[in-house]
């Protein structure tokens, strides 16, 4: 795996740890309200908090498995699988929620795939 791919895939992992933080730890924070464009009253609803925390675990696991693939197993296949997963989720989010998601969430993942194609 090239150093460029390693750096970009690490950025994708860190981004998902940050999303985990917002969704599972800072559920009712100003940052979470801004990122997800929801008011604090909505974020305080138990059903919303529960859904966010559940989604946060998925994002943390994406980060964990990317770090595992990059630094422990040195498996390009694992990195590709999880980066494609991120691109798929970002594409769905762009189609159903906010078009900017494809750049914000998907951008680093797309750059990672491109770096794999060009630099492996």
Q: What are these regions, as identified by a protein language model?
A:
Residues 2-26:
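N-terminal signal-anchor transmembrane alpha helix
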Residues 12, 56-67, 109:
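Core segments of transmembrane alpha-helices
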Residues 21, 88-100:
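C-terminal ends of transmembrane helices
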Residues 25-48:
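Cytosolic, membrane-interface loops and tails of multi-pass inner-membrane proteins
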Residues 43-61:
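Interfacial helix-start motif at the membrane-water boundary
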Residues 73-84:
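Structural signature of hydrophobic alpha-helical transmembrane segments
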Residues 116-120:
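Juxtamembrane boundary at the C-terminal end of a transmembrane helix
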């Amino acid at each position: 795996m090239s150093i460029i791919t390693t750096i970009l895939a690490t950025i994708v992992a860190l981004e998902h740890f940050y999303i985990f933080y917002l969704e599972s730890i800072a559920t009712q924070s100003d940052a979470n309200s801004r990122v997800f464009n929801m008011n604090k009253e909505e974020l305080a609803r138990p059903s919303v908090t529960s859904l966010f925390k559940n989604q946060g675990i998925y994002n943390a696991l994406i980060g964990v498995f990317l770090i595992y693939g990059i630094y422990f197993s040195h498996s390009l296949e694992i990195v590709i699988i999880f980066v494609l997963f991120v691109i798929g989720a970002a594409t769905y989010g762009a189609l159903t929620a906010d078009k900017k998601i494809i750049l914000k969430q998907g951008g680093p993942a797309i750059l990672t795939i491109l770096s794999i194609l060009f630099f492996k």
